[in-house]
Design a protein with these regions (language model features):
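Generic short beta-strand segments
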Residues: 63, 132-137, 171-172
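Bacterial N-terminal signal peptides that target proteins for export
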Residues: 1-15
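Extracytoplasmic/secreted envelope proteins and their assembly/folding machinery
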Residues: 96, 100-104, 110, 192-196, ...
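Short secondary-structure boundary motifs at beta->alpha junctions and helix caps
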Residues: 82-90, 160-201, 208
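A structural "domain/chain start" motif
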Residues: 27-96, 206-214
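Surface-exposed short loop/turn segments
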Residues: 27-49, 54, 110-160, 178
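C-terminal motif of bacterial Sec signal peptides marking the signal peptidase cleavage site
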Residues: 22-25
Length: 214
């Protein structure tokens, strides 16, 4: 390779390096100016302990999300039924994991069951609770403060013979007091707690009936 060719090659390498640095600088600038993400956590409602302890263990499998709900994003329905999400806001985990954890916490809080655990626990269980997330969104299509809707389809069955003993929908709704994020999250929590209270009550009723007849 002659001297001229080496000079051209060296100049090209320098130009490429400068271009890469410029791109990296732009990307860094974009990241530094991006809106920070705020993570919101929901709390399970305190549940009054049951007067009767059922000698059964329940396993709660990871909730199954309906289309659009397999995300950590906080969803909102806009005009024309457009499913969107609140920018700069998220749940601490994927929504199915959030719902599953809250359902387990609520059932444990009832103090009516020998044990309640998730599908990862290496323990045996007598019953299995399956949850499908049908609704978990804020509806802002009306233009005012959003209304939050939560609907969980539940199937409860025995583990030994795979017999379904109950199917029901646990639902809740709440209107945000204002069109701001803190009020929307408060409405999410209220609607979720309503739905989980129904889930706990219906689950315990079904277990009480099944254990008394078997």
């Amino acid at each position: 390779m002659n001297r001229a060719a080496r000079a051209i090659r060296a100049a090209a390498a320098v130009a490429a390096a400068v271009a890469l640095l410029a791109v990296a600088g732009c990307a860094s600038g974009l990241r530094s100016g991006a809106e920070p993400t705020v993570t919101y956590a929901l709390r399970a409602a305190p549940v009054a302990g049951s007067a009767k302890l059922l000698d059964v263990a329940v396993r709660v499998d990871r909730a199954v999300p309906a289309p659009g709900f397999a995300s950590e994003r906080i969803l909102v329905v806009r005009e024309d039924r457009r499913l969107d999400h609140y920018s700069g806001s998220r749940w601490p985990e994927m929504l199915p994991d959030v719902v599953t954890a809250l359902a387990i916490e609520t059932l444990r809080g009832s103090a009516a069951l020998t044990a309640v655990h998730d599908q990862r626990a290496p323990f045996t269980s007598d019953y299995l609770l399956l949850i499908t997330i049908r609704h978990f969104e804020a509806d802002a299509s009306g233009g005012g403060a959003p209304q939050v809707r939560v609907a969980l389809e539940c199937t409860l069955g025995r583990r030994d013979d795979r017999v379904v003993i109950a199917t029901f929908t646990a639902a809740g709704s709440a209107s945000a007091s204002a069109n701001r994020m803190s009020a929307v999250i408060a409405a999410y929590e209220a609607a979720t707690q309503q739905a989980l209270a129904v889930l706990s009550t219906r689950t315990l009723e079904a277990l009480t009936l099944d254990t008394s007849t078997n």
